[in-house]
Amino acid sequence: MPSYMRLCYGKGLRNLLIFFTPEPASFEQLILVHSPTYVRQFLSLTLPQREAIRIGFQQSEQLVRREVSLVGGTLQGAQYALENGCAFNIAGGTHHAFSNRG
């Protein structure tokens, strides 16, 4: 069980929270914020070295899966909040996007 889930359950919130594994954000969703060129390079692990260094993480399939899942979770959480009044992404807050870089 992930640490945030254990923390929430330990605080007696088990019956108040719904945890879900998000669907990864699609290419179409990602290019609503980032340029198509940047997204293609990120997804194919072909970012220029300078940009990869700026992000601060080594390019890898694991990083791509993590980031598109985080974005997907934020989008799904926002939709849930619109429908139900409240939501939060326990993995969010680490992504600060610009159109042409991470």
Regions found by a protein language model. Give the residues of each.
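HDAC/HDAC-like amidohydrolase catalytic core signature
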Residues: 1-102
